[in-house]
Amino acid sequence: MKTKRIHQRIPQRIPRIIHQIWLGDNRPKEWMNSFKLIYSDYEYKVWDETNIPALWNQDLFEREEKGCAKADILRYEILYRYGGVYFDSDMIALKKIPDEFLDNEFWSAYENEVYVPGLVNNAVIGCVPNIL
């Protein structure tokens, strides 16, 4: 995996917390469990309807009807508050991200250039708290 450093190293590292969100039924447990296995040295947190904290954008979250848009709001609020690494729940963990990724303030996945050139992806995000 090629990476390009755009930030200098900072004293605070991205916390070793994996965040995933699932709103609704039919949670893909096998896929989500792959993160618990691969990232066994990280805290693992699943956010769902039973444990959503009070949000700064609570009104927007409650008005939104689409689950994917609610998850977008929730992911940014959770990452801002706690920091860590967010992965969409429809992904399977095959291998850990390199530890040096935790030495940045923020990083995000980049979409495949062949299929969607120039698109930053929000399915995988890492950041320190209070950065977004």
Name each region found by the language model:
Residues 45-73:
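Active-site-proximal specificity loops/subdomain of glycosyltransferases
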Residues 19, 109, 126:
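Residues in well-ordered beta-strands of folded domains
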Residues 13-16, 42, 103-105, 120-122:
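Sequence-level motif detector for i,i+2 pairs with an aromatic at +2
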Residues 1-56, 129-130:
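N-terminal anchoring/stem segment of glycosyltransferases
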Residues 70-120:
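GT-A fold catalytic core of metal-dependent nucleotide-sugar glycosyltransferases
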Residues 119-132:
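Substrate-binding rim/cap in mid-to-C-terminal beta-strand-loop elements of soluble/periplasmic
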